[in-house]
Amino acid sequence: MTTAAATPSAALPIRPLAPGDLEAVVAIDAALGRRSRRAYIERRLAAALREPRLHAQFCATDGDALAGYVLARVLEGEFGRSAPALRLELVGVRPERQQHGVGRALLDALAAWGQRHGANELRTSAAWNDHALLAWFDAMGFRLAAGLIVDRAVGDDADDERREDPQDAPGDTHGEVDYGLQADNTAALLARDRADVRTMSRADLADIVRVDRRVTGRDRSAYIDHKLAEAMDDAAIRVSLTARLDGQVVGFLMARADLGDYGRIDPVAVLDTIAVDPAWGHRGVGAALFSQLGINLRALRIERIETIVAPQDFGLLGFLYARGFAPSQRLAFVRGG
């Protein structure tokens, strides 16, 4: 999408995307010079049909043709979030209709939908050196968000040999961090051997809700249910995990990996939540989950994992930095709020 000031033209009708719009969306996406993301777009449209309350997808029409589209998903509870927001997933305007205010009209429609549904913020991210996209975000009213994006490479030995400082870090971590790993770099291996870490399934819902309630002190059943559905149905690759000790679920890690989020053309794993039952803390459960996640991601040839953290959440940042995370080359942006 080019970035010069848009010249408004006659307002185009805007309506919700429908299943029959798939081919048009794929064609516009391809016309913008991107690698084919047909499967990703198809999953996003299907997800909106399954759970319309969690998705907002609109298009601008030019006669019988689509002039542009925008897709977003509701964010509900990632790392303690209390107020809902919208995650901008995909936006595109047909090249010959750019510079005519179509993108702005689509974002305005998205923002209006969010306000009606209690989601007053529109969130997204971009690489700091994607100057064209950053200029467009600026023109559309986005500003830098407070969240800090951190990421790390999924290296050959990072998960098995990463050392972690054993002391507790300060700050509000929402209880979603286990600081129990010993400084000895064999602890991750031992924890993974002791804990039964396996791919998350729908049958785990009640156990995950139980652990989450013990960690956060809140009932986030709806959020957990929706995240589990996203992990099972919406992502191209299932990477969420549970950890069991003595036959019961004592921790979980929710992550997703897909091709297309935020306009990226390479798959990246995104960590949404990690939690360990406080009764099973200081036993390396968090380390075991991360260790297995790294092994799985390497097998899938996914090279990076990222998450977003409140800058004042020093406890969570300390835990992630100890696992090899560092500030990302991507910046978080927000509109509204």
Where are the predicted features?
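Conserved acetyl-CoA-binding loop-helix of GNAT-fold acetyltransferases
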Residues: 93, 99-112, 276, 282-295, ...
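Residue-level recognition of the GNAT/N-acetyltransferase active site
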Residues: 89, 94, 98, 127, ...
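A short beta-loop-alpha structural element at the N-terminal edge
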Residues: 12-25, 194-208
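Conserved GNAT acetyl-CoA-binding A-motif
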Residues: 114-126, 297-309
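Acyltransferase donor/substrate-recognition loop-hinge adjacent to the catalytic core
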Residues: 2-6, 154-202
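Acetyl-CoA-dependent GNAT
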Residues: 16-20, 27-83, 89, 202-203, ...
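Conserved acetyl-CoA-binding loop of GNAT-fold acetyltransferases
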Residues: 138-147, 217, 321-330
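Conserved beta-strand-loop-alpha-helix junction that forms the acyl-donor binding cleft
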Residues: 124-133, 307-317, 334
